[in-house]
Amino acid sequence: MRLTVVGNPDNRRVGLFTAAVLAAGLPRPAVLPWADVLTGAAPPPAGALVRVDSPGEDPQVDRLLRRSVASARHGELIGLADTYAGLVDGLARVAAGGAELLNDPADVAALCDKRRCHARLSAAGVPVPAALPSIGGYGELRAAMAEAGWARVFVKPAHGSSAAGVIALAVGPRGVRAVTPIEIAPDGLFNSLRVRCYDDETTVAALVDRLAPEGLHVERWLPKAGLGDRVVDLRVVVVAGQPTHAVVRAATGPLTNLHLGNARGDLAELRAAAGPAAWAAAMQTCVRAAACFPRSLHVGVDLMFLLGWRRHAVAEVNAFGDLLPGVLADGRDTYAEQVHALTSGRWQRWRAATKVLSGAVTGREPVACGT
């Protein structure tokens, strides 16, 4: 077995996967840089087995994806829709040579569009927060919230990642409150590592209106379960249909992403709070979420238990959600687990099984958590 990785050569993701491949006794994978893909390099040929890694964290690649002559400034929220279009085009280029991709381009395209991902999960009966129809700006958002009877929502850029541009918005008799990592500067919007609160409605309205042209996905803000004084959710990595690795994310506010200064929680404590039956049901939901993207070796599922621990919902599914440094299961990290799935035949068996079952998940009634 000879693997190729499409990625940014100096990125730790490529390094961690390469280490896992070598530890399994396989040849060092070839690396095809994203920058080369986007500037016309020949794609991997038929017969190659290709892992496509995140194109993020590289200014040159970001500029190429956006088809821009100018680099984005650090943290700048710019060209999210253009970046998505560039990613979809880049994936098509990678696939053009007939190689077998471990991240199917159609799956990745759906996963990187929160609207399409939510619709696919809902249609398959996976519990997700209820969502509003397309929103063109703040006025439409407030009108849709009023019609739905919702006081709290998450406003998400359709093509954002890592909480970039996300706004947790609450409205009430005393006004509005928006919790977000967005820093508003005179010359643009910037994603920050510090969460901010905005309570001036004019400011909040302008923020939503500036993000809206990139495309927005708006979901009901569901009350999460908590441990101690923090709310919690989970990142669960599903490899070849099996939930193998999980990290608890604990926060004092609504945004739980670890890079925003939040802490890893205690998985054993969370499992004890949920109880065996609720935990098993949640893991089965992660399997069902992954089965919505059956041609992808792995996905990262963001799963939340709701207040009371008896119900749960999937907040997001991530195409490149396997970066969980230091988290081991059966002695393997997420990258070693993926290599094991390939060498053991589990990946091939799961793909065959999902092909058989794919007809069973079509045509089902959408499922959404409304409370």
Describe each region flagged by the PLM.
Residues 1-4:
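Extreme N-terminal starter segment of soluble prokaryotic enzymes
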Residues 8-20, 24-135, 139-143:
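Conserved N-proximal alpha/beta basic substrate-recognition cap immediately N-terminal to
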Residues 10-11, 159-162, 223-224, 243, ...:
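Short, solvent-exposed loop/turn segments at secondary-structure junctions
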Residues 67-78, 177-190, 259-268:
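A solvent-exposed, charged loop/short amphipathic helix patch at secondary-structure junctions
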Residues 93-215:
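Active-site nucleotide/adenylate-binding loops and adjacent lid/helix of ATP-dependent enzymes
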Residues 155, 165-169, 175-181, 230-250, ...:
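Beta-strand scaffold of nucleotide-dependent catalytic cores
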Residues 198-309:
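A long amphipathic alpha-helix within ATP-dependent nucleotide-binding catalytic cores
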Residues 258-298, 305-371:
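C-terminal active-site "lid" helix and adjoining low-complexity regulatory extension at the edge
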